[in-house]
Amino acid sequence: MVLSQRQRDELNRAIADYLRSNGYEEAYSTFKKEAELDMNEELDKKYAGLLEKKWTSVIRLQKKVMELESKLNEAKEEITLGGPVAQKRDPKEWIPRPPERYALSGHRSPVTRVIFHPVFSVMVTSSEDATIKVWDYEAGDFERTLKGHTDSVQDISFDQTGKLLASCSADMTIKLWDFQGFECIRTMHGHDHNVSSVAIMPNGDHIVSASRDKTIKMWEVATGYCVKTFTGHREWVRMVRPNQDGSLIASCSNDQTVRVWVATSKECKAELREHEHVVECIAWAPDTAHPTILEATSSESKKNGKSGPFLLSGSRDKTIKMWDISTGMCLMTLVGHDNWVRGVLVHPGGRFIVSCADDKTLRIWDYKNKRCMKTLCAHEHFVTSLDMHQTAPYVVTGSVDQTVKVWECR
């Protein structure tokens, strides 16, 4: 591109102003002479700082162009996948779309967990600020704060009715809350270190918890007594999750393993060992996903004749793995995140996996084709947790940036 005489003159004056104002006197004199510039103080005022302004605006434009190119590529990809001409898309294929519907502020420290209520249009979040907050996700309104823990609240879990909420904390306790009266009805002591994870069993009679003390404990809801302790992990147990019928309990740990336990006998049914770093998160695949999983992994699954249940794990090695618990085999490894994977779940429709990570993204995976089909830049800092509503078209994410975001799916 050739500059006109006027543009050339303006550029030369802007360069001269930059050299002079930054103290490059010798270069300024030489340049002024070479460019045959007649510097006029009044005239040159309008060129003050012009070069820096142009430079920053070029960078800004480049960034915008890159963003637009990325969106264009996403759109092309979706068209290739038969994507979202999707006002008519089947709810089983709803996926979160940017931008977020709400970005909710209120926590004063990183958000550690986000979960939807199983019945009402509310969600609950926990934070390192030692509080639990309740929000209306449809209206984007804050409703109330539950206080009681004296240190970071690490995890929260509803029972299937949504009447009880369990929470656990770095204060080494587990609390049970009446979610109708928003009161703490029981505090359980027994772990010797930070309690990192909690889950109410599907029957609602027991709670399981995992701790940095390397143990998993089972507690009776009615009495608050510890009735079982599961030992075997060699390091901090990061997360614990029961399967759909409560017969199995999965756990993951800093020892880089995932273990599956028989709930009644405490027997370790499987020890899954292929991750190369701390395993941060786990999630059971719902029954609705089994046909797609079997189709996607037919060769691996059919070798043994029996298959399932299936478990997902996410690790600091940046990968997500899918396991067949009947055989202990890793069926697939999904690679794409650029940092620690912090949350993972199977889409309620059974066809996709949704994950979040310290690379600040939310990703949707078409696991049948073992590829990431959509990446959302979700937060300005690490994304610590996500949840997807079982029936309504919403995903929620929480972050170290102290915000909670609600994403609409379509």
UniProtKB/Swiss-Prot annotation:
Cytoplasm as UniProt keyword: yes
Subcellular location: Cytoplasm, Cytoskeleton; Cytoplasm, Cytoskeleton, Microtubule organizing center, Centrosome
Classification via InterPro entries: Dynein_regulator_LIS1 (IPR017252), G-protein_beta_WD-40_rep (IPR020472), LIS1_N (IPR037190), LisH (IPR006594), PAC1-like_LisH-like_dom (IPR056795), WD40/YVTN_repeat-like_dom_sf (IPR015943), WD40_repeat_CS (IPR019775), WD40_repeat_dom_sf (IPR036322)
Pfam families to which the protein is assigned, alphabetical: LisH_PAC1 (PF24951), WD40 (PF00400)
LisH domain ranges (all copies): 7-39
GO molecular function, one term: protein heterodimerization activity
Primary location class: cytoplasm
Summary of subunit composition and partner proteins: Can self-associate. Component of the cytosolic PAF-AH (I) heterotetrameric enzyme, which is composed of PAFAH1B1 (beta), PAFAH1B2 (alpha2) and PAFAH1B3 (alpha1) subunits. The catalytic activity of the enzyme resides in the alpha1 (PAFAH1B3) and alpha2 (PAFAH1B2) subunits, whereas the beta subunit (PAFAH1B1) has regulatory activity. Trimer formation is not essential for the catalytic activity. Interacts with dynein, dynactin, nde1 and ndel1.
Name of the protein described by the UniProt record: Lissencephaly-1 homolog B
Species, as recorded: Salmo salar (Atlantic salmon)
Gene: pafah1b1-2
